[in-house]
Amino acid sequence: MNTEEAIELITQNYSASEGSLIFSLHERNTFSSRQFWDLYDSIDTVVNASHHNDQLTEQISSCYQAILKMLIWHFDAKDLFTIECLPYDYPWYIDCLDYAVLAYYRKNPEILKSAGRDNAVKRYIDCLDKGSIPWSRMFTAYGTAENYCELLSALEQTTDIEQWEKNYNRLSDFEHQSTLFPPAPFVLVFLVRILQQLLRNGNADAIVKKLLDRFLYYAGLCNTAESMDHAEPLRQFSDLLNDENLLPEDYIEEDLLKIYEDPDAISDQLFYSFYYYAKIVLSEVPDILDYYKCYPDESKELRRRTENIPL
């Protein structure tokens, strides 16, 4: 994002133009993490470009106050205003915005770095879009994950336990015999989002219990992997999608057979990363359960199994 694009995006939020975070909050009562990070990036860009003027200052200040006000109203029992899809850890987003605005006013980009709020892993999870993941280039226990996007969409749209389990079982081969495969951390991102959706709507208790049972199981696998000698994980979650870590675009059956038959076909670093990033994703679940004041026993056990995660 260059300075001109950043200023334009700030102006769009100031004007509550369609597609901006403030438009979504005010007109659609919806919080979009992607739109939040777009606004955050725009402020960060003008800070690093040392671009300041009275008009921009007014726009940033107005956007900041409007966002805070709408988030506060979300908890006003006397107000009919309600924000859908508000993340359980919304104060963290407010903190991020606080530091961005403070950095602008003080003309000091180091504030953002020293604050340690720009967490790359959490941000990556926030903005992950299942439609942009190369599922067909990830191997599973029985082939590839080419149909995972459609199956995850089906899981999002059903509250019937029998149909849900049927679809879930079709994508459950990201784990087999206590082994996680490349799609695992990515699938878990969307399963955690489905959990939040179900808790927010207050329905499908049977599905919630099914998810929590599986989350506990996967967290246990991650702990087992962590307790053994292992390589360092890949530096970034997104590195899992680097070309060298995926199947060739024109892969053939022999490519899959080599992976299944040759224990050295996958590096120790890549293999451990499946567990490392899966555990990071699962570490968010206890706070989600606590936010919705439900399933305290599962929350306690999941927290025990996912503690000491740098998220």
Residue map of PLM features:
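Alpha-helical repeat scaffolds in large eukaryotic proteins
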Residues: H26, D41-H51, Q65-D76, D98, ...
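Amphipathic protein-protein interaction modules
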Residues: D44-D98, N203, F215-S227, E261-Y272, ...
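Conserved hydrophobic register position within alpha-solenoid helical repeats
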Residues: I60, Q163-R170, V208-F215, L270, ...
